[in-house]
């Protein structure tokens, strides 16, 4: 086999290795905390003939993304006049690092535009952060207003689960107040997490969390997991019969703890693809080495 074929194989090997790198990058570029939980879009479209609202909205997005490198909560109002101002905020989950917070929040402006378009108010909630904005004069809602709920499909009634979950709820409610707005813990294989919006006091936070937990008990019953999102706080729980998995955040995504099997399936698929691509790359490298040796031997015999 000539030098030209060897060159082709070398190029193929480089392409395979590049693909392998892209697969690893793609896997690491979509962390758990960027999963979309829900969106809330005002029905009324934004009338903006002067473009002032758009300017204020763009400035607000820029401020929120910039501040997400320094803090997990930030609220601001932008605009040239009070009539054309926009108030917005973001909040990251309390267990995220500054870097993770930024990675989460930086996705929200684009997502908000894609999911809601230009409306007078919008809210986009990911697993690890959310963004909210509204124009001046937008009607306010109660902090206890239910925005979104989800309960796991599997039930675990009759196993003592509800008693354990309710005990975990009590621990979490006290912990959120003591933690000034965020708390996560595990109690007898029940993982619970609660967080309040960063601009409310401990007393209001406690009331909001209590309301959310009561809703979780009623709405989700004996479901293996659940999430309740109110306007000013949210709670989530998940029961893991075999123990809470050791990972950066076992906070349940918007299905149930059964969703962990989905994550596991995704991870298995990724590993399988990586093994196939890696194996192919290894074989390709071996073939190239053998051909290189063959060419050297051929050249040696040609010289005699």
UniProtKB/Swiss-Prot annotation:
Disruption of the gene: reported phenotype: Both pdlp2 and pdlp3, and pdlp1 and pdlp3 double mutants show altered protein diffusion (measured using GFP). In pdlp1, pdlp2 and pdlp3 triple mutant there is inhibition of GFLV 2BMP tubule formation. Virus cell-to-cell movement is negatively affected. There is a 22% reduction in mean surface area of infection foci by GFLV and an approximately 12-hour-delay in long distance movement in comparison to wild-type plants. There is also a systemic delay in Cauliflower mosaic virus (CaMV) spread.
Q: In which tissues is it expressed?
A: Highly expressed in inflorescence pedacel and shoot apex. Expressed in the outermost L1 layer of the shoot apical meristem and in the epidermis of bulging floral primordia. Within the L1, expression was restricted to the peripheral zone (at protein level).
Quaternary structure and interacting proteins, as annotated: (Microbial infection) Interacts with Grapevine fanleaf virus (GFLV) 2B-MP.
Q: Which cysteines are joined by disulfide bonds?
A: 41-116, 92-101, 104-129, 151-220, 196-205, 208-233
**Family of the protein in this entry:** Belongs to the cysteine-rich repeat secretory protein family. Plasmodesmata-located proteins (PDLD) subfamily.
Give me the Cytoplasmic side stretches, as residue ranges.
294-304
The answer to keyword Ligase applying to this record is no
InterPro entries the UniProt entry points to: Cell2Cell_Antifungal, GNK2, GNK2_sf
Q: What membrane topology was assigned to this protein in its record?
A: Single-pass type I membrane protein
- Protein keywords: Cell junction, Cell membrane, Disulfide bond, Host-virus interaction, Membrane, Repeat, Signal, Transmembrane, Transmembrane helix, Transport
Q: Which GO terms describe its biological process?
A: plasmodesmata-mediated intercellular transport; transport of virus in multicellular host
The transmembrane residues are: 273-293
Q: Where is this region: Necessary and sufficient for plasmodesmal targeting?
A: 273-293
Describe the task this protein carries out.
Answer: Modulates cell-to-cell trafficking.
Q: Which residues lie on this side of the membrane: Extracellular?
A: 27-272
Q: Which stretches make up the Gnk2-homologous domain? A: 34-138, 143-242
One GO cellular component this record assigns the protein to is: plasma membrane
Its name, as the record gives it, is: Plasmodesmata-located protein 3
Q: Where in the cell is it found?
A: Cell membrane; Cell junction, Plasmodesma
């Amino acid at each position: 086999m000539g030098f030209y074929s060897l060159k082709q194989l070398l190029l193929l090997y480089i392409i395979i290795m590049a693909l392998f790198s892209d697969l690893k990058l793609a896997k690491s570029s979509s962390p758990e905390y960027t999963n979309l939980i829900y969106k809330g879009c005002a029905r009324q479209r934004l009338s903006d003939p002067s473009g002032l609202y758009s300017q204020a909205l763009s400035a607000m997005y820029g401020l929120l993304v910039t501040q997400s490198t320094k803090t997990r909560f930030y609220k601001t109002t932008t605009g040239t006049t009070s009539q054309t101002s926009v108030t917005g905020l973001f909040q990251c989950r309390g267990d995220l690092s500054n870097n993770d917070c930024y990675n989460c929040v930086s996705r929200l402006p684009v997502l908000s535009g894609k999911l809601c378009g230009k409306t007078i108010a919008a809210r986009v909630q990911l697993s690890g952060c959310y963004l909210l904005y509204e124009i001046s004069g937008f009607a306010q809602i109660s902090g206890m207003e239910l925005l979104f709920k989800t309960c796991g499909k599997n039930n675990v009634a009759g196993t003592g689960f509800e008693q354990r979950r309710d005990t975990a709820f009590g621990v979490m409610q006290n912990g959120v107040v003591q933690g000034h707005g965020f708390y996560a813990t595990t109690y007898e294989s029940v993982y619970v997490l609660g967080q309040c919006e960063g601009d409310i006091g401990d007393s209001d936070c406690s009331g909001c969390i209590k309301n959310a937990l009561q809703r979780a008990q009623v709405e989700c019953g004996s479901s293996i997991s659940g999430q309740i999102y109110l306007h000013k706080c949210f709670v989530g729980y998940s029961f893991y019969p075999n123990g809470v998995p050791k990972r950066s955040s076992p906070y349940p995504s918007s299905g149930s703890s059964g969703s962990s099997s989905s994550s596991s399936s995704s991870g298995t698929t990724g590993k399988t693809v990586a093994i196939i691509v890696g194996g192919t790359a290894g074989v390709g490298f071996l073939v190239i080495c053998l051909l290189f040796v063959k060419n050297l031997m051929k050249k040696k015999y040609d010289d005699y």
